[in-house]
Amino acid sequence: MGQRVSRLGMIAMTLLAAGVALYSLRFAAAPFGAWPGIGPDIRGVIEQFPVRALIHMLVAPVALLIGPFQFLPSLRARFPRLHRWSGRVYVAACVIAGLGGLATALHASGGPVAGFGFGLLAVLWIGVTLGAWRAAVQRRFQRHRLLMRFSYALTFAAVTLRLQIPIGFALGYDGYAAMSPWLAYTSWIPNVIAVAIYSAAAQRRAALAVPA
């Protein structure tokens, strides 16, 4: 039962990540003066800071797409070289998109409260991902896998944020800028808490499985 739930959760996570990543391709039209599905708040940020904003918006989906496959034990075992190279691409995408996000957070449409939240997310995203990469280089694979869980929890904020936007409208907020002061925190803090709970439970199960 537990394995089935875990498998279904992985499938749901992958599908949501793929959907958001593909939807983000609409930002590629912005340099050509087209704004498909891009609201005025986001458009304003892109028009004011096109390079840093588009770097974040077009590179982050790469990490979002790659991430779920890095957690598949069968892929790691059968194709270790592919796992390593896709992991390098993931790390590079997180760092580049994180730097773009950090630079853009300074001018968040939701003001300084939103800017601080998104800036903190970017700093943690870069730091945790680089820590996971360093652990892999040092062959500390248990720590590497733990930090990669937290890294992808931060990456997955792109999905969580979009899932929460309809809630904002239901609560009476009239646009993204009005919601972003709380989305800047609720998009990623619950993800981190969920990973912390999951990792602690996994550690307890592993300890119980060790014969006395």
Residue ranges and their predicted role:
Residues 1-212:
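Alpha-helical membrane insertion/targeting regions
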